[in-house]
């Protein structure tokens, strides 16, 4: 049990640096707008056992408004978690995106997601490109997705210009 309370946006990743960047972006957001969506971050490696997945789904996922999971190694890396999160999201109508943990598309993860593919791709690209600006844009876009507006989302900024 990670001991987390429910949040509007939940992001799971095995990359601590990615989670730290999103935590810093959330701190910046809350400075500007303390009433903005809440964020819960967790390292998926802390949810390795089926029971920990079940507890997390019950305590956090079922109450989320958007769930984003980034998995290196695809569904095979975390099959029980993928199945349980997909089931909970379907039952509760929660938008869910399973994203590859690297820069290669993963059709199987996309198929387990219920968020439209363009939205999945945009969220993924914010994380692939990295950096503070893209972390801010990731959270801005996530907030727009849960509020019903996303037409004015800024494109991911390439971390390294070609």
Stretch-by-stretch model annotation:
Residues 1-162:
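An N-terminal assembly and electron-transfer interface module characteristic of large anaerobic redox
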